[in-house]
Curated annotation (Swiss-Prot):
The keyword Repeat does not apply. The gene is rps27ae. Signal peptide: none annotated. A zinc finger (C4-type) spans 22-41. Disulfide bonds: none annotated. It comes from Nanoarchaeum equitans (strain Kin4-M). This is Small ribosomal subunit protein eS31. One of its GO terms (molecular function) is zinc ion binding. It comes from the Archaea.
Length: 61
């Protein structure tokens, strides 16, 4: 069992989640070096903006 009590803190009498929560399904997201990822639904959020490549006026992300 993961030490789930480490994922929460009590502030002003309210329970606050320390980890990022998935906007799609509501479970905790795993924190990786360059992204946050939800193992339950597969949602991924990148920490840094990826550079955009412009070739002949067309933008590739």
């Amino acid at each position: 069992m993961a030490q789930v009590w480490k994922y929460y803190e009590i502030k002003d009498g309210k329970l606050i989640r320390k980890k990022k929560v998935c906007p799609r399904c509501g479970s905790f997201m795993a924190e990786h070096k360059d992204r946050y990822h939800c193992g339950k639904c597969g949602y991924t959020e990148w920490k840094v903006e990826r550079p955009k490549i412009v070739i002949h006026g067309a933008t590739i992300e």
